[in-house]
A protein has these predicted regions:
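Enzyme catalytic cores with a strong preference for nitrogen-chemistry domains
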Residues: 1-247
Length: 247
């Protein structure tokens, strides 16, 4: 909480006393000598010191309290390598997504931030692609992403539309800060109320609705799709058996 970056953000809060800040960051954790190491722990060269790297969201409320959430859904091959002790050297040739590559540390579940009396749930980049991420109780979705690695392709546009899907599924408004992508304000129906151009420096101001509604999808997930697949498999088996018996 006393790092240079955190202190600079707190200095900004002194100018705007009611300001709550949510930003993306690359964070690190040093392991104590006797502490159990994770499978993603990295070793400092020529030192018996281990550390983990995280793709994180940092929240500082208007009282100066600092909370941190570490990304749960990591990008395969870039932020998450299978068999890390064997394949981690491949991280050097992995796609550059604008942050630290290789196997990152992660949390097991989404952590929401308390803003006054409302819960704001951060989604970091690739997490906003997942409809089954398990958001739990929340009033507002906040997406932090770096879309610059897509450059000027359809990728950053598709990523924006995934945010619209999350809004519709959860019936929650979405505020989206996309570094070099399209930042936007999206209502609970998936309508884009405000948006930046691609790769544009912009400041947005908006009143967003805070919803307590829990949709059937948010509670049950993709059960309709799973049931449909199961029924389709049953029909295929029945058809196969019928064809075999008719011969």
């Amino acid at each position: 909480e006393n790092t240079y970056s955190i202190n600079k953000l707190k200095e900004l809060q002194k100018k705007y006393p009611n300001l709550n800040i949510l930003v993306g960051a690359t964070t690190y954790k040093l392991f104590n000598p006797n502490e159990k190491k994770t499978s993603t722990a990295r070793k400092i060269s020529n030192e018996d010191i281990f550390y983990d790297v995280y793709n994180s969201a940092i929240f500082i409320n208007d009282s100066g309290y600092v909370d941190v959430y570490h990304k749960t859904k990591l990008v395969p091959g870039v932020e998450k390598m299978p068999f890390p002790k064997i394949l981690d050297p491949l991280a050097k040739i992995a796609v550059n997504l604008g942050g630290t590559s290789g196997s990152l540390g992660s949390e097991n579940y989404i952590n929401s931030f308390l803003v006054n009396t409302s819960l704001v749930t951060p989604l970091i980049c690739y997490e906003s692609v997942h409809g089954d991420i398990g958001l739990g109780e929340t009033n507002l979705l906040a997406i932090i992403t770096n879309d610059g690695w897509w450059k000027n392709t359809a990728g950053y546009k598709q990523h924006l539309n995934y945010a619209r899907l999350r809004a519709i599924e959860q019936r929650k408004s979405v505020v989206r800060s996309a570094n070099t992508g399209i930042s936007s304000i999206i209502n609970s129906r998936g309508d884009v109320l405000q948006k930046s151009n691609w790769d544009e420096v912009v400041c947005m101001q908006a009143n967003v609705s805070l919803s307590n509604t829990n949709t059937v999808y948010s509670q049950l997930g993709d059960y309709i799709g799973r049931v449909s697949v199961f029924i389709a498999i049953i029909f295929l088996i029945m058809t196969f058996v019928k064809v075999r018996l008719s011969k």
